[in-house]
Regions:
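Active-site and adjacent substrate-binding regions of carbohydrate-active enzymes
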Residues: 1-642
Length: 642
């Protein structure tokens, strides 16, 4: 509804900030009513709501004024491309700066290595100041605008962004919205007794409300950090600490917190970040009597952030790191009239987990059962697809998906956990259980891609056949991530077949967290082996290089909501069709350790059966048979048929 008073306020703001950009005014005009309605829905009852809303509008204008001409030009180029992040051209890598290269200053020297592989989108793991020994890998932030000394400076980051931009590469960094370190300036001011800053966090005089809340709040780290509240002696209060005791949860019922954190989002946008990764968005709103995850207000806050960035910094996309149940993940793309106006990206954690499930069992039915949820993703948003990342693997797919495949959920998950943690006799995988809950026996999994695929144990045994099988598994897993829809994100070290790194056990700041086993320190002498034929590193690297090249050559794999999963004709073979109009490719993946066959009837899906197809991966030409004829796939083989 047109609101003359609000439009007048907008024009006064634009005038006072001396903004003459017609496109900015157009975007602001289109969004201001929704910005106000979302703000009022959350904060309308706050005694200073009107003044704080004015502060919010000012911060949007100021962010645009602060945006460089270069970035505004890049915004316009992205707008011209349309939804640039849906393209098949994007292939990413996630990395820790120190463990990959040393410092930010050293990263430009590593770009040729990444470009040779085909990577053009970098996710730099947390960069900002966090206390040594209490950093949670950089997710306990002490200062959102100061780069960790050992990594470099903001100037180094700006220079690196410029280097990426010159190479037409993209940058993603994290913002931790849910919490800060207890050494953050706001936490220090709260500890000093300043009430205004105590209201930036959740603090309680006694255990009454914490006890109530803990009845319904799941524990995140039950082993290393049980409970969701920590007693602070200096304050003589209980502080909400959902993750670790040194991470204080921010109180978003306080609009000042929202405006401050939005300012940090804008700061990152104006560094030239192409995608901001919002860590743990599911947790940002808390309410007694709930799990304090995935609440409606959390979505309203994310939508409000998206609207504000669409106005001031429109070239920056948002990734919501919501590792939640399959049905709930869809909500992070926005619902109803806000579909595709919340997060542009979400991690396809369900697809990642069901791929690991299929690899352990040789049975793809659970993967197939998950697809009707995943196919609900709206056109215009996309997945970030991956096989491994810095985090653990959670088996978060729904029980009914397991039951429909004929398995018992508890027993099935126990099998998967045992298979990958080395407790299952005969399993080649080498990983470990993470965050075991002694009450429920729930647990997640740590381990590198290569070690979970059996490479570590095969090398230990010097078993050449097992080494080759593990490489085949690695490439199978990566191939599915390349073609299943979304932007594939590799994890550093995986491109060279790095196995688990156990050096974390000797570091008191890391030894309690076995996820560090799959966060290697790159040995660049070893990485020279990616160019030496016959090495494991070379086999993995060159296969990935070829996969990326193939992906990039196929506009049909851009994420245009153009995927159709094949009906089950073999419990070990997952298959889907990617299509644009009459054009299609059929992708088949054998998750079994044995050769498998599938009927040529699959070629009828999405159009008339061709007489001949070419496997774009192997280069093989194949004559298409009748329904009673079968196409063969070797163990862990995949085919991309056109």
């Amino acid at each position: 509804v047109y609101n003359p008073a609000l439009q007048h306020k907008l024009h006064e703001l634009v005038k006072s900030h001396k903004i003459k950009d017609a496109k900015f005014v157009e975007r602001f005009t289109a969004n201001i009513d929704d910005i106000q309605s979302h703000f009022n829905a959350i904060y309308g009852n706050h005694p200073h709501a009107a003044n704080l809303f004015q502060s919010l509008l000012n911060s949007i204008c100021q962010a645009f004024v602060d945006r460089s001409d270069d970035l505004k030009k890049r915004d316009a180029q992205k707008e011209k491309k349309g939804q640039w992040f849906l393209s098949q051209d994007l292939v990413g890598m996630s990395l820790y700066v120190d463990r990959f290269a040393g410092q930010i200053y050293d990263l430009p020297g590593k770009l040729p290595y990444l470009q040779k592989l085909g990577v053009n989108f970098l996710h730099l793991m947390p960069l900002f100041k966090s206390p040594e020994g209490e950093s949670d890998g950089g997710y306990a932030v002490e200062d959102f605008r100061v780069v960790e000394d050992r990594l470099g400076s903001i100037e180094d980051l700006r220079n690196f962004q410029s280097a990426l931009q010159k190479e037409d590469m993209y940058l993603m960094i994290d913002i931790v919205l849910n919490h800060t370190s207890h050494h953050h300036e706001w936490a220090k001011l709260a500890k000093s007794g300043i009430k205004e800053y105590q209201e930036y966090f959740y603090m309680y005089e006694d255990r009454r409300i914490p006890d109530q809340m803990e009845e319904t709040m799941p524990e995140i780290f039950p082993e290393s950090s049980p409970g969701s509240f920590t007693y602070d002696e200096k304050l003589d209060k209980w502080v909400m600490t959902v993750f670790h005791h040194y991470q204080w949860d921010l109180n978003y019922t306080n609009p000042k917190v929202f405006i401050e954190m939005l300012g940090n989002v804008f700061f990152y946008a104006n560094l030239g970040v192409d995608v901001v990764r919002i860590d743990a968005p599911a947790f940002i709103w808390k309410q007694v009597g709930t799990s304090c995850q995935n609440l409606p207000e959390a979505h309203q806050l994310l939508q409000l952030i998206k609207m504000c960035t669409e106005v001031a910094t429109p070239g920056m996309a948002i990734l919501g790191e919501a590792i939640v149940a399959p049905a709930q993940i869809m909500e992070y793309f926005g619902t109803g009239r806000y579909a595709t106006h919340e997060c542009d990206f979400a991690y396809n954690a369900t697809q990642m987990a069901v791929q690991w499930d299929a690899l352990a069992t040789g049975d793809v039915r659970i993967m197939q059962n998950a697809q009707h949820e995943l196919l609900r993703k709206p056109l215009g948003a996309t997945w970030l697809t991956y096989t491994r990342c810095h985090d653990d693997i959670g088996l978060g797919y729904d029980d009914y998906m397991i039951e429909q495949a004929g398995f018992t959920p508890y027993d099935h998950r126990s099998y998967i956990k045992n298979y990958y943690s080395g407790a299952q006799p005969g399993s080649p995988a080498k990983g470990a259980l993470f965050a075991v809950n002694p009450k429920t026996q729930d647990a997640r999994l740590s381990g590198s891609l290569a070690s979970l695929c059996g490479l570590e144990s095969a090398i230990e045994k010097n078993d050449k056949a097992a080494i080759q099988t593990s490489i085949d598994k690695i490439i199978l897993m990566q191939a599915m991530s390349m073609f299943v829809g979304g932007v594939p994100m590799l994890f550093y070290g995986d491109e060279a077949g790095y196995t688990n790194d156990y050096s974390y056990l000797n570091d008191s700041g890391k030894s309690y967290d076995n996820r560090w086993m799959h966060r290697p320190i790159i040995n660049w002498e070893r990485n020279k082996s990616v160019s030496k034929k016959g090495t494991t590193e070379n086999q993995v690297y060159t296969a990935l290089q070829q996969l990326i090249k193939l992906r990039r050559s196929l506009p049909i794999v851009a994420d245009l909501k153009n995927i159709k999963w094949l009906e089950n004709h073999n419990n070990s073979i997952a298959g889907f069709v990617r299509y644009i109009g009459e054009e299609k490719i059929t992708c088949l993946f054998n998750f079994s350790s044995a050769p498998q066959e599938i009927t040529w009837f699959i070629m009828d899906s999405n159009g008339q059966r061709p007489a001949q197809v070419k496997d774009l991966w192997s280069g093989e030409s194949l004559n298409v048979g009748m329904d009673h004829d079968h196409l063969g796939l070797a163990p862990y083989q995949f085919r991309i048929l056109k």
